């Protein structure tokens, strides 16, 4: 498994190099990097028997898209909460998101990955549509909210799996990333910060205790499905255990 450790570490460093723009570093927060998404992408593409240079290229470019989306969302979330945040800082954060997105298009176009660009563009479209529904509390059922959570968190990875014919990874990605997002929302809610998922659920269920029960129930169900999946897919379980350990170091 040493090659997995080395490959993962090398890819993470390549991604960091792309993100280290000297001007942005001085004025805005460092972009959030979802280590688990890197690990899932690396593990899935590793199982597709791609060469390490190909894996590195795809993981870095796809994570640039994810970070661009997360950076733009960070501006939207903070705009109403931090009235004293400088206008310049917000503008630079938006520009940073655009910069990361532009890097993604550039890197994929250099390799003429037109089909993958189209697939990821569809994923971006779906993510943005579900973000709008979540923030506008446009859902009619609890299942609709959960669907939006899963799409927002996993669409880029799901489209990548479709492109490389890795359908056996898709359920696992859904369980892990859905659970992670709900855990993050619970932490935000506990700290009395803005939680889009809690607010969306509250739009349907008014009782605060019931809202917490529902979201905790979703997390337990996803964790159960994740564990059951790993029991039945030892190949993914082995890769996952190595990458999980690495992503925590």
Predicted regions mapped to residue ranges:
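All-alpha prenyltransferase/terpene-synthase fold signal
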Residues: 1-249
């Amino acid at each position: 498994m040493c090659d997995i450790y080395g490959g993962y570490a090398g890819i993470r460093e390549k991604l960091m190099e792309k993100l280290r723009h000297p001007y942005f570093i001085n004025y805005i927060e460092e972009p959030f990097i979802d280590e688990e998404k890197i690990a899932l992408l690396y593990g899935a593409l590793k199982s597709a028997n791609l060469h390490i240079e190909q894996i590195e290229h795809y993981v870095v470019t796809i994570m640039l898209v994810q970070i661009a989306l997360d950076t733009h969302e960070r501006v939207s979330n903070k705009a109403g909460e931090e009235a004293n945040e400088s206008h310049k800082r917000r503008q630079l954060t938006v520009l940073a998101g655009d910069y990361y997105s532009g890097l993604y298009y550039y890197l994929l176009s250099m390799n003429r990955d037109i089909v993958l660009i189209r697939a990821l563009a569809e994923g971006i479209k779906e993510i943005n549509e579900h973000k709008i529904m979540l923030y506008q509390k446009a859902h009619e059922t609890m299942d609709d909210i959960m669907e939006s959570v899963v799409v927002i968190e996993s669409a880029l990875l799901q489209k990548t799996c479709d492109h490389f014919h890795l359908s056996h990874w898709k359920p696992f990605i859904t369980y892990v990333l859905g659970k992670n997002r709900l855990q993050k929302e619970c932490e935000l809610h506990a700290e009395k910060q803005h939680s889009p998922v809690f607010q969306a659920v509250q739009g349907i269920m008014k009782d605060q205790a019931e809202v917490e029960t529902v979201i905790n129930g979703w997390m337990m169900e996803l964790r159960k499905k994740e564990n059951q999946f790993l029991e039945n897919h030892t190949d993914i379980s082995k890769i996952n255990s190595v990458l999980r350990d690495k992503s925590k170091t």
